[in-house]
A protein has these predicted regions:
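N-terminal pre-ligand scaffold of iron-sulfur
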Residues: 1-69, 83, 96-113
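Short cysteine clusters
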Residues: 55, 74-77
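Short cysteine/histidine-rich metal-coordination sites, predominantly Zn2+-binding motifs
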Residues: 69-75, 88-97
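Short helix-to-coil "ATP-lid" hinge immediately C-terminal to the conserved N-box Asn in the Bergerat
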Residues: 80
């Protein structure tokens, strides 16, 4: 997921190492950065999910919210998103959150960028 101007060449997407699996225990989330983009990494029952760390309503960082199961709640106006799909579950907005493909190899978590 990269934005490119008409003058930029299209770059291939690749998996970027972002964290050690052991550093993000089940039921928790953390923030990683790829090319200055904040990505929220969530561990739901041992499965990792990545989404943009920004609620579309007032740009609040979702990583400062609350994770319950597969639902992350925005700390500002309590919009709720499914971390597996980025889909809005409930809240004052109608926009979903972009997600990123995740792969785990050994103890390293990779995000497709």
């Amino acid at each position: 997921m990269r934005g490119a101007s008409a003058t930029e060449q299209e770059l291939p997407e690749e998996f970027v190492p972002v964290a050690k699996a052991g550093d993000v225990p089940p039921g928790s989330m953390t923030v990683v950065a790829i090319d200055r983009e904040r990505i929220m990494l969530a561990n739901v029952d041992g499965q990792f999910f990545a989404l943009r760390d920004m609620c579309g309503h007032r740009n609040a960082p979702l990583s400062r919210g609350r994770l319950e199961g597969c639902i992350v709640e925005c700390p500002l106006h309590f919009a709720q998103f499914d971390v597996r799909t980025g889909k809005l579950v409930d809240g004052p907005i109608s926009a979903d959150v972009p997600i990123y493909e995740v792969r785990v190899e050994g103890d390293t978590v990779f995000v497709k960028w």
